[in-house]
Amino acid sequence: MKAFTQHTGLVCPLDRANVDTDQIIPKQFLKSIKRTGFGPNLFDEWRYLDVGQPNQDNSKRPINKDFVLNFPRYQGASVLLARENFGCGSSREHAPWALDEYGFRTVIAPSFADIFFNNSFKNGLLPIVLKDEEVDALFEQAEATEGYQLTVDLDAQTVTRPDGVQYSFEVDAFRKHCLLNGLDDIGLTLQDQDAIRAFEAKHQQSSPWLFGAIK
């Protein structure tokens, strides 16, 4: 998993509340269990004017020029600014996979759906909860200023505007540790691999009948 320490990036303001996971990555793209291949279909039903299908050549599809991700000024955005209850709906890890592969490192919103919030941390995407008035101020500035960037410092737990104004956010200490060090569940387990091997060796000596060949 990619570590997250500090990131400065272009902001894309998605001014919609209650964005659900089917809008983030529609159900027809969920057949794959690989983590890759979802970025091109992020917000597919909003980015395109037709119905997308897996493995389709998106370069030949009609683009919705009125959708914010298609605006030239937001190309290359890595900070997604959203409204309340982002990531609601059914549980699908494909949602943070799609956001991450598209290029977003963090999502800032007043609130998130619990399952999406948890899945994001496990997949290297930092969800940040700010106060309503702080999010409102960021929307106002991002929409008014082309090339608007924010700096997110996970260690300091701050979001810094171009004018130097900082907002603080809360994050669970364990989740913070995992993101700072790029540790997913497998990475955490591998930290204890020596102890696991020692236990297995000791267990095999004390209970050899459990390890005999099955005939």
UniProtKB/Swiss-Prot annotation:
Record function comment: Catalyzes the isomerization between 2-isopropylmalate and 3-isopropylmalate, via the formation of 2-isopropylmaleate.
Domain of life: Bacteria
Record SUPFAM superfamilies: LeuD/IlvD-like (SSF52016)
Transmembrane segments: none
Pathway: Amino-acid biosynthesis; L-leucine biosynthesis; L-leucine from 3-methyl-2-oxobutanoate: step 2/4
One GO cellular component, as annotated: 3-isopropylmalate dehydratase complex
GO molecular function: 3-isopropylmalate dehydratase activity
Organism taxonomic ancestry: Bacteria, Pseudomonadati, Pseudomonadota, Gammaproteobacteria, Pseudomonadales
Catalytic activity: (2R,3S)-3-isopropylmalate = (2S)-2-isopropylmalate
Disulfide bonds: none
Protein name, entry field: 3-isopropylmalate dehydratase small subunit
